[in-house]
From Swiss-Prot:
This is Pyrimidine-specific ribonucleoside hydrolase RihA. Transmembrane segments: none annotated. Keywords: Glycosidase, Hydrolase. The gene is rihA. The active site is at residue 240. Signal peptide: none annotated. The lineage of its organism: Bacteria, Pseudomonadati, Pseudomonadota, Gammaproteobacteria, Enterobacterales.
Amino acid sequence: MALPVLFDCDPGHDDAIAIVLALASPELDVKAITSSAGNQTPDKTLRNVLRMLTLLGRNDIPVAGGAIKPLMRDLIIADNVHGESGLDGPALPEPSFAPQTCTAVELMAKTLRESPEPVTIVATGPQTNVALLLNSHPELHRKIARIVIMGGAMGLGNWTPAAEFNIYVDPEAAEIVFQSGIPVVMAGLDVTHKAQIHAEDTERFRATGNPVSTIVAELLDFFLEYHKDEKWGFTGAPLHDPCTIAWLLKPELFTTVERWVGVETQGKYTQGMTVVDYYFLTGNKPNATVMVDIDRQGFVDLLAERLAFYAS
């Protein structure tokens, strides 16, 4: 039986590829997709969800737009990474259908209520929508199997020296998620920076030869340019968000540890930092499964295998 999934995202090149991977995987039943503000403004990330689902021929999936800003802060976007549209590079189709008239939180709550079994929430942007859901619907916590997030790191950052972008945008929301009592799975920079897609991998995807694999290759062409900056020391583009979906499909590709994680919301230098109690110094019970390593080649092979799905 397919695993029911709610997908909250802020497309974003890597979010878009995570959508492609999820919808090529019969192991997953994506019940709804909600958009968050982060990689681009909320109107653009919502439109990008609709554009991707139009490309994939999946206008049957309900879509709703989420919060327009973080819980307590002004919005920060990553247009320097993802471009003016949020998905610069390929020529994507215009949306062929409209989003739901309800909010993201309302769609999430409806989906949870109607599901006969607990649902896995995958969140690959800031945690604002998920935190709002948890705060406004405590009665639905029991309907959430786990929350799988892309965010955070153990001791490094990609937006500040201490903070990863998704957590930095809305640290208060992330803290609500981590302390909710619901199992959290964290795909942080420790693992996603190892999930690099090289130029030869992109050409492998392109050679698959279907319209979706071509778009994915063109997304990666654009995404790779930003990551060529010498400061990163990368040999490719880290494909952050698809790690969440890959973990659901093939957890054996990842090395994980069970640890307590908190989020710094006040620090002068460390705002947005995920504090991972690696050596059990706090005495706090672990609240997260933290990914620390990945079989990169296995990850690339999984992407290539699932891109072939779209040939049919």
